[in-house]
Amino acid sequence: DCPSGWSSYEGNCYKFFQQKMNWADAERFCSEQAKGGHLVSIKIYSKEKDFVGDLVTKNIQSSDLYAWIGLRVENKEKQCSSEWSDGSSVSYENVVERTVKKCFALEKDLGFVLWINLYCAQKNPFVCKSPPP
């Protein structure tokens, strides 16, 4: 059984949180709510996406367009290896982090079932998922 206020679906527990956080803070928050908790992961070819979309649609404020999910592009091993004209190496990480949309959210269009990539610093409501206690 899931804790009070959480919804059960195919052996996992889910909860929508309206408070807006950036992606990393939302992920940390989910891990503090329940043992094994994370921002929601969604199997693409399953009814889980409809369940989660429904959960968000029923609970989100009408003005909100996005809800974070637990997907983030990790590009650590693909650092660009360009060089400056004087031969010194370039690291783009400090530039890229702020300018590339690496974190994924559910998008309001079509009922929160489609994913969109956003800036990770953007603050959005989110869905946590955890195994039952």
From Swiss-Prot:
Localization per Swiss-Prot or TrEMBL: Secreted
Tissues/organs with expression: Expressed by the venom gland.
Entry superkingdom: Eukaryota
Subunit structure: Heterodimer of subunits alpha and beta; disulfide-linked. Botrocetin and vWF form a soluble complex.
Single annotated GO MF: toxin activity
Coiled-coil annotated spans: none
One Pfam family recorded for the sequence: Lectin_C
Keyword terms, alphabetized: Disulfide bond, Hemostasis impairing toxin, Platelet aggregation activating toxin, Secreted, Toxin
Cystine crosslinks: C2-C13, C30-C128, C103-C120
Biological function: Snaclec that binds to von Willebrand factor (VWF) and induces its interaction with GPIbalpha (GP1BA) (via the vWF A1 domain), resulting in platelet aggregation.
Domain spans labelled C-type lectin: 9-129
Name this polypeptide is given: Snaclec botrocetin subunit alpha
SUPFAM superfamilies assigned to the protein according to its UniProt record, in alphabetical order: C-type lectin-like (SSF56436)
The UniProt record lists the keyword rRNA processing: no
Listed SMART domains: CLECT
